[in-house]
Amino acid sequence: MARMHTRRRGSSGSDRPTADEPPEWSDVDEDAIEERVVELAEQGHDPSQIGLKLRDEGVQGTPVPDVKLATGKKVTEILEAHDAEPELPEDFRNLLEKAVRLHEHVEANGQDHQNKRALQNTQSKIRRLADYYRGDKLDEEFAYSYETAREIIEE
């Protein structure tokens, strides 16, 4: 599959091994995993960071290689069930942060044409994702602008 704003192909990688159940060495209780997920979310970690922490640090010293295999739910589903989900989806928030950083850089460095183009591409991605999330995770009247992005990020 191709990338969005280039003529190159996407990067390929190895597939994860298919598994129907968690490995034998990772026998952590589902409730303990859910508690740890909510605890990490309350500390301010994003869902992807939570997955990495569970993989590396684990619960009670035992690593959890795949939360969905261990609990039957994704990290975001666990957060929704415990009312600890972030206000905005993680991918959308990351794009907003990137756009704010790029906008400030372009204002300070007006001749940086490469990053002007990068800002345009990022804003395009934000508008596409906003269309996808509008009405569900975003307000129906949401319209992207630098000011609204900065306000959202500062919250």
UniProtKB/Swiss-Prot annotation:
Compositional bias (Basic and acidic residues) at which positions? 34-45
**Record's keyword annotation contains Repressor:** no
* GO CC entries: cytosolic small ribosomal subunit
GO molecular function per UniProt: small ribosomal subunit rRNA binding; structural constituent of ribosome
SUPFAM superfamilies named in the record: S15/NS1 RNA-binding domain
Locate the compositionally biased regions of type Basic residues.
1-10
What GO biological process term is on the record, naming one? translation
Superkingdom: Archaea
Q: What is this protein called?
A: Small ribosomal subunit protein uS15
UniProt gene name: rps15
